[in-house]
Swiss-Prot record:
InterPro entries: HI_0552_fam. It comes from Haemophilus influenzae (strain ATCC 51907 / DSM 11121 / KW20 / Rd). Pfam families: HI_0552. This is Uncharacterized protein HI_0552.
Length: 207
């Protein structure tokens, strides 16, 4: 079984991410850091590809961000899914592994917003007639909250908490597993099931 553990998160607990800094302060560690990243990323890639196989139609091939951009290693592993016919949309099912947790959510991909087939106001349509009961156990957070923050559950917020502060404001909704609990789950099933539960909200973004 493809698995994630606390060690998968601890990969990101390094003092420097940029190779220039590593060369200056810990050059002898670079080969091991690269090898560790590649090993864990290959496992991450296999997990995401297995999720893709489980999801099937109408999902497009996932985007899996590389473990390095050439001048630094990543502070997290990131992948996202979209429908085949929404490839140009900035609304995504985001899957992220960082030093704290595994997180799966409906997200607005800001970097793609200027080329998106929908705008952020259309993305926010998932908030219309939001079913607080159905998503009670999901976590929800504003776009400017850190990926390392404690997230609130839907069950502890009310409709007035969801009011948008500006035209560019948005919420993310999803589920996460803290690193200490990762060895208790099947990540492929967890990611697949969470995305499937979020599909009705994703569909509403594109109405």
């Amino acid at each position: 079984m493809l698995s994630l553990t606390a060690e998968s998160c601890e990969l990101f607990n390094i003092p420097f991410y940029q190779f220039a800094q590593m060369k200056k302060f810990c050059p002898e560690d670079i080969p091991a850091i690269k090898a560790d990243y590649k090993l864990h990323w290959d496992n991450w890639k296999a997990i995401i590809q297995s999720v893709s196989a489980q999801l099937g139609t109408p999902f497009a091939k996932p985007h899996i961000e590389s473990w390095t951009n050439g001048w630094q290693v990543r502070a997290h592993f990131f992948a996202y899914f979209k429908y085949e016919f929404n490839q140009n949309s900035a609304a995504i099912f985001s899957v992220l592994l960082n030093r704290r947790r595994l997180r799966v959510c409906l997200d607005w991909h800001c970097y793609r917003a200027d080329r998106s087939q929908i705008n952020v106001q259309q993305y926010n349509q998932w908030l219309d007639q939001f079913d607080f009961k159905q998503f009670a156990d999901f976590e929800i957070w504003r776009e400017d909250e850190s990926e390392y923050d404690d997230f609130r559950q839907v069950k502890v917020i009310s409709e007035k908490n969801l009011i948008l502060r500006s035209d560019e404001d948005f919420w993310c909704i999803g589920k996460s597993i803290e690193k200490a609990e990762l060895n208790q789950i099947d990540p492929v099933l967890f990611i697949t099931h969470t995305i499937q539960q979020l599909q009705p909200l994703y569909d509403r973004c594109h109405q």
